[in-house]
Each structure stands twice: as C-alpha cells, then as structure tokens.
C-alpha cells in the first residue's frame, strides 16, 4: 500500500502521485500526532552515530619439524572486537537508591548484597528522579558501545601419514571476555546505568579444548582378508561454557523481567558442563577389478556412552547467595535451580556402504 504514494502529504495530488492521509489510515490503525504515549509503551531506537562492528586480529606461531614426518607447533591468536551492539534502556536514571537484603524463601539464606532499585519507595514518590519518562515502560536504544577480546594459545603435535599411520594431537587454552554477548538474550545488563559491571567472561568462553585423532591402516596389505582396513579414532574434550545466574523476576524495578541476576552475582559466573567423547571409524575397502571398489564403513559416536549434559537451569531466585561460581548438578531435577535441562546424544552407531567406479 505504501509503495503507491506518499504518507501524510499536505495537499494530496491525484493519480499515481496521490498521498496516503490520516483519513485513509483511520479504518485500519489509530493515527495521532499529539498527546502522550500510552502507559506501558516500549520504544526502540538506534544510536544516531551507530557504527558497524570492527575487529583487529593478530597471530604468531612457530613450527619445528622432527625427523621426516613429525612436527610440533605453538600458536597464539588475538582478536579484539569493538562497536558491538548493545541495547541500553535510556529511560532509566542513576537517581535510583541502593538497597540491600532480599529474604530467602523456604529456608534459603538471605542475599544481603546491595543493588540499585528503581522500584524503591522514593522512585514511586518521585518518578522523575528515577525515570526519564515515567509514563512509558522502556526506551531501548541500540548502541555500538560493547567490545570483546579473545586470547588463544594452541599447541599441536602432528605426524604426516607414512608407514600406514598419521596422528594429530591438539590442545587449546583460551579466554574470551566481553560486555554483551547478545542483546536479544538474558545477557542484557542487570544495571543499565552501570554497564562497566557487565564486563565478564563471554558466553563463548571455553578455557580448555583437547583433540586427539589418528588414522591407522592395516599393515597386512598382501592378505586378501586383512588388507584394506582403516581405523580412525578421535578423542575430544571441551571444558564448559559460562552461564548467567538469573533471579527469574524483576527484582530491581527497572521494567526488565528476564535479565535480573541475584544481587552481587557477576555476569556469567556459572560454569556449564564439560564435554568428552570417544568416536571411531572403521572401514574395509574391497577392490572389484581395476576400476571399481566397494567400501564398508562403521562409525561410532560417544562410544563410551558418556552422559554429556548440555544446558543448566540457571533461574536460581533473587535470594541466591554467594558463592556464585557454581556448576550444574544431576542431583536435582531439571525444574530445580542448577539442574541439568538437556543432554547431547548418547552412543550412536551407523553403518555405510559405498561403491566407487
């Protein structure tokens, strides 16, 4: 409809240049250019000088060959990203008072740590002290003010394929820190007027990663039965990702209901479950004359059938008290705080047949 003319012109011309006026829109939407915004309005806008994200990267490495087929290497990777998006509620003012003491429920201890509270009585008596426009709910402005930094060190041992055998052993130690991982998630700021307090481990931080992979061919190449076999094991381990502890309610009265943390809890202070798996691939190649071959494969994933938990119930309540560097546990149900809520697949085996010609 809007592509057929202009919206809200002065004296509307006729024909293809006709305008869409308020009277045209009235049967479909309410049009008003005057008056205050309805209570509970949520506004979204963009920073006037919004900038696109930028990244600076650097890396350095050294590699040493040992013998004819072995090598070792060490590498360092640095990535600094700036002007990342962050949704900031500009309706909140720093005049809200500091309060402390959230009583525990069902015998839980009280969290007595201080936090800034826009729901305090002083804000109810004098809303303009705490809110730029007390009549609206939120005024979210997308700003390019967040940044992130990544440091990674990689050690690697490698053997090129020779004598029917190859090997790769890799260890990565890394750390990722940022202000905001995703402005559409529960990682929004707990205190919108103290954004520096949000700087912590990134959602993608993973401190340790180990991979061991090998390929072994059958040494009996002249045997019709034992030749053509190939065995490829992979062992992998990843340490857990951080997760945010959430109160599950708007405890600080800022009209944001999904991002509040227990008072005093740093962002991403929980540590998620680690991952470990042993996978294998076994294949047998049979030549069918000079131009064709048949290959049977059997692949197994998570052969040890280890339970690799994926996510944690991070809603722990407003009265959750230190220590905050907690982990998930299988001792409680998924509906309880810190209970595991999902797991990755158990042991899987798949068979395949491939004909090449």
Q: How should each PLM-predicted stretch be described?
A:
Residues 73-224, 234-238:
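Gram-negative outer-membrane beta-barrel transporters
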Residues 103-106, 308-357:
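C-terminal beta-signal and terminal closure region of outer-membrane beta-barrel proteins
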Residues 1-143, 252, 257, 266-269, ...:
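Solvent-exposed loop/turn elements at secondary-structure boundaries
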Residues 46, 56-60, 151-155, 208-214, ...:
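Hydrophobic, lipid-facing positions within transmembrane beta-strands of outer-membrane proteins
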Residues 55, 67, 162, 174, ...:
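Outer-membrane beta-barrel channels and translocator barrels
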Residues 59, 65, 71-75, 166, ...:
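Membrane-spanning beta-strand positions in outer-membrane beta-barrel proteins
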Residues 64, 159, 216-218, 284-286, ...:
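Residue-level signature of outer-membrane beta-barrel architecture
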Residues 23-35, 202-203, 221-291, 295, ...:
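Extracytoplasmic gating/loop element in the C-terminal half of outer-membrane beta-barrel translocons
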């Amino acid at each position: 409809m809007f592509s057929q003319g202009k919206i809200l012109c002065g004296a509307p011309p006729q024909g293809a240049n006709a305008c869409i006026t308020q009277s045209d829109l009235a049967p479909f939407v309410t049009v008003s250019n005057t008056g205050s915004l309805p209570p509970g309005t949520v506004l979204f806008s963009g920073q006037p000088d919004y900038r696109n994200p930028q990244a600076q990267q650097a890396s350095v490495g050294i590699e040493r060959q040992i013998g004819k087929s072995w090598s070792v290497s060490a590498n360092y990777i640095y990535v600094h990203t700036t002007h990342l998006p962050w949704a900031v509620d500009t309706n909140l003012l720093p005049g809200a008072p500091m309060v402390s003491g959230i009583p525990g429920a069902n015998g839980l201890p009280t969290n007595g740590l201080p936090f800034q509270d826009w729901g305090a009585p002083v804000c109810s008596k004098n809303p303009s002290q705490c809110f730029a426009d007390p009549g609206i709910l939120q005024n979210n402005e997308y700003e390019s003010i967040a940044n992130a930094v990544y440091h990674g060190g990689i050690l690697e041992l490698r053997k090129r394929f020779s004598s029917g055998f190859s090997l790769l052993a890799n260890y990565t130690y890394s750390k990722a820190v940022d202000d905001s991982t995703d402005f559409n998630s529960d990682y929004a700021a707990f205190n919108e007027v103290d954004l520096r307090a949000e700087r912590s481990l990134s959602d993608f931080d993973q401190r340790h990663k180990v991979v061991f992979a090998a390929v072994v061919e059958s040494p009996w190449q002249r045997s019709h039965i034992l030749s053509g076999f190939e065995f490829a094991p992979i062992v992998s381990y990843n340490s857990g990702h951080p997760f945010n502890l959430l109160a599950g309610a708007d405890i600080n009265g800022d009209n944001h209901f999904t991002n509040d943390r227990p008072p005093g809890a740093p962002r991403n202070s929980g540590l998620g479950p680690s991952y470990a798996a042993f996978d294998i691939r076994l294949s047998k190649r049979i030549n069918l004359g000079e131009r064709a071959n048949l290959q049977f494969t059997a692949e197994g994933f998570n052969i040890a059938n280890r339970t690799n938990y994926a996510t944690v119930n991070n809603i722990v309540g407003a009265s959750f008290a230190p220590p905050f560097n907690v982990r998930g546990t299988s001792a409680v149900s998924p509906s309880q705080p810190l209970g595991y809520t999902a797991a990755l697949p158990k042991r899987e085996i798949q068979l395949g047949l491939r004909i090449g010609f």
